């Protein structure tokens, strides 16, 4: 059903409402500061016309749910579904584009957003700040599926920082986009879940993507009511989750505990391998494992004073043991000039023959913290902090 109304940015008048007296839905949005008076053709209820913005695997799950809803003719939730994604150097494109093409959905590459008419926009892992002019094209605004319990972990990498900081509880927030600032709009729906012990960021993202997709469909089924009941984010508890840089992957053996190193590995290991120095050469640690108690009982590990970064090969378990601030971590494989197992690394660099005949100083035969050159990004950092305050 379509109705022609004179409105100020928000849902149409409720059925039976008197002219000149705004509906509860409109009043809720007006309190949130949206004003763009014009004549427009909008819908009071589903099916909705949706424009989806997304890029990665997390976003693809939300798009899959929207597509399934559009194909479900009995529920009549989605009438029209089109997609905006980012350009990619890969011919196949990003995961969202791949799914859109396979599903024969119209797809545009940013900044092209098409010229169709839509009721509501949906964003998931898009990575671009949407301007006010674009947001105001959607009668019901633009929703964001964000994988954290806002206001904790605003920004582009919430799942990574959830794992990196050892959070035990996380969740998904469906919020409404605001122009000029990231992740600060009103919360329409929020659900929490425990973080599975020792889960990687990739594994946690898969859990949250399914939860977020289900929550999105729930919000769309009652969109005007959800908007009317939206609540502002609290001021306290806001944290920022910046993108991960190569410098984050550099292990600080003297400063980081074994727990911190394992959290770092679970958070970013599948994106950027952890890095350190070996005899002035960068070495990547590919496969980290926890060290069991039987290995720790070895006299070689307890009978001498060790410097953080010291490396010992444990023959029985075929792993490299590396000493950090408070204990040991295990490494099964590394990348030097090529990929090496722990045994290969021992034979090439730790074997007594090599230690005897090498010109390397004993102090060099340990892992040392890699110091990458830092770029001056102070202005950008300040600007990003202002975006979330």
Swiss-Prot record:
Gene3D superfamilies xrefs: 3.40.50.12230
Catalytic reaction equation(s): L-methionyl-tRNA(fMet) + (6R)-10-formyltetrahydrofolate = N-formyl-L-methionyl-tRNA(fMet) + (6S)-5,6,7,8-tetrahydrofolate + H(+)
Effect recorded for residue 125 to L: In COXPD15; loss of methionyl-tRNA formyltransferase activity
CDD domains to which the protein is assigned, alphabetical: FMT_core_Met-tRNA-FMT_N (cd08646)
Disulfide feature: none
EC id: 2.1.2.9
GO molecular function, one term: methionyl-tRNA formyltransferase activity
GO terms for biological process, alphabetical: conversion of methionyl-tRNA to N-formyl-methionyl-tRNA
UniProt keyword Iron-sulfur, yes or no: no
Function: Methionyl-tRNA formyltransferase that formylates methionyl-tRNA in mitochondria and is crucial for translation initiation.
Disease named in the record: Combined oxidative phosphorylation deficiency 15: An autosomal recessive, mitochondrial, neurologic disorder characterized by features of Leigh syndrome and combined oxidative phosphorylation deficiency. Clinical features include mild global developmental delay, white matter abnormalities, ataxia, incoordination, speech and reading difficulties, T2-weighted hyperintensities in the basal ganglia, corpus callosum, and brainstem.
PANTHER family per record: METHIONYL-TRNA FORMYLTRANSFERASE, METHIONYL-TRNA FORMYLTRANSFERASE, MITOCHONDRIAL
Name this polypeptide is given: Methionyl-tRNA formyltransferase, mitochondrial
Lineage: Eukaryota, Metazoa, Chordata, Craniata, Vertebrata
Gene label: MTFMT
């Amino acid at each position: 059903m379509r109705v022609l109304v004179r409105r100020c940015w928000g849902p149409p008048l409720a059925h039976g409402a008197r002219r000149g007296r705004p509906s509860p839905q409109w009043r809720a949005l007006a309190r949130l500061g949206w004003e763009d008076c014009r004549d427009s053709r909008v819908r009071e209820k589903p099916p909705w016309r949706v424009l989806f913005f997304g890029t990665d695997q997390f976003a693809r799950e939300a798009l899959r749910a929207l597509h399934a809803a559009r194909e479900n003719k009995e529920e009549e939730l989605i009438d029209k579904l089109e997609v905006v994604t980012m350009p990619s150097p890969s011919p196949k494109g990003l995961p969202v584009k791949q799914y859109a093409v396979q599903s024969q959905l119209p797809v545009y590459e940013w900044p092209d957003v098409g010229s169709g008419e839509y009721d509501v926009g949906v964003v998931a892992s898009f990575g671009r700040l949407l301007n006010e002019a674009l947001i105001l094209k959607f009668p019901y605004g633009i929703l964001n599926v964000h994988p954290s319990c806002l206001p904790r972990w605003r920004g582009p990498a919430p799942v990574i920082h959830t794992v990196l900081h050892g959070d035990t509880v996380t969740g998904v927030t469906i919020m409404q986009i605001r122009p000029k600032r990231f992740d600060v709009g009103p919360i329409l729906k929020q659900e929490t879940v425990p973080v599975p012990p020792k889960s990687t960021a990739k594994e946690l993202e898969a859990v949250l993507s399914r939860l977020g997709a289900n929550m999105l469909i729930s919000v769309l089924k009652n969109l005007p009511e959800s908007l009317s009941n939206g609540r502002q984010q609290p001021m306290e508890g806001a944290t920022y989750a910046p993108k991960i840089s190569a410098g984050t992957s550099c292990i600080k053996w003297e400063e980081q505990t074994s727990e911190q190193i394992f959290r770092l590995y679970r958070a970013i290991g599948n994106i950027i391998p952890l890095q350190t120095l070996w005899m002035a050469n960068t070495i990547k640690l590919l496969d980290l494992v926890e060290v069991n108690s039987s290995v720790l009982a070895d006299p070689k590990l307890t009978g001498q004073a060790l410097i953080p970064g010291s490396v010992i090969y444990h023959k029985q378990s075929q792993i490299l043991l590396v000493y950090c601030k408070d204990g040991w971590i295990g490494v099964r494989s590394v990348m030097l000039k090529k990929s090496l197992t722990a045994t290969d690394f021992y034979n090439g660099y730790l074997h007594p023959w090599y230690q005897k005949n090498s010109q390397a100083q004993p102090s060099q035969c340990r892992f040392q913290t890699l110091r990458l050159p830092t770029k001056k990004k102070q202005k950008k950092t300040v600007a990003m902090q202002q975006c979330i305050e």
